[in-house]
Amino acid sequence: MISNLFKSLRLTIAFCLFFSVFYIFVLWLFAQVAGPNKGNAELVTLNGKVVGAANIGQNFTQDIYFWGRPSHAGDGYDASSSAGSNKGPSNEEHLALLEERIDTFLVHHPYLTREKVPAEIITASSSGLDPHISPKAAYAQAKRVADARGWSEEKVMGIVNSHVEKPLLGMFGTEKVNVLKLNVALDQASNNKFLISQLDLGYEIIRKKSSSLGSCILNGIFYVG
């Protein structure tokens, strides 16, 4: 019996060392060698000012910008509280929130019907940090952004198309658009009116909490619908 107890104890210690030291080291080493930006946050600058991290979504609500996915991570896009809502598809509170988001989206996009509202725009990702939307979700917002900026829809669509990222190696993930990079490109095309750099986007929170290695790697490689 004592012998079995020591075997169990040794096995427990071995697993603790493996998963808390060796496994973490292997992930870190992989990120340093093969991960985007060596597993660190990809900082995005505009007019000499850091406006966010490309690996972590932000809450854009103005009509002149494209909107990303909702977030249930902390107060929103908090890498230290990465999570979804964990509410089931039949949860009444969840369904009411979806209806509210659909109504809000349609107020700003009256040219769309309820059936045309992109599902990803009203549903949060499992990480709560997703910085990407699909090209389809961006196209649905193009007219609203164009009208708000006084541009032609074709001009906005051209900027969107130039920011569509292909699947990794042509097979991993799907096509995606980084919302922050897209919005920065809009401002860069706005006769030097760098609007994002004037916004309080909570970058200090992002800077301090964007060391969530797993989320940064996954969001940098895949688009998770």
Summary of predicted features, one role per range:
Residues 2-19:
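Aromatic-residue-lined binding/catalytic grooves and analogous aromatic/hydrophobic interfacial grooves
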Residues 3, 96, 100-103, 158, ...:
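Solvent-exposed alpha-helical segments within well-ordered globular domains of core cellular machineries
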Residues 7, 20, 27-148, 164-167:
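Flexible, solvent-exposed loop/hinge segments and secondary-structure transition points
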Residues 140, 144-199, 203-205, 217, ...:
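Extracytoplasmic/periplasmic C-terminal soluble domains
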Residues 211, 215-216:
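Targeting/processing segments of secretory and organellar proteins
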Residues 221:
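Short acidic/glycine-rich loops and adjacent helix/strand connectors
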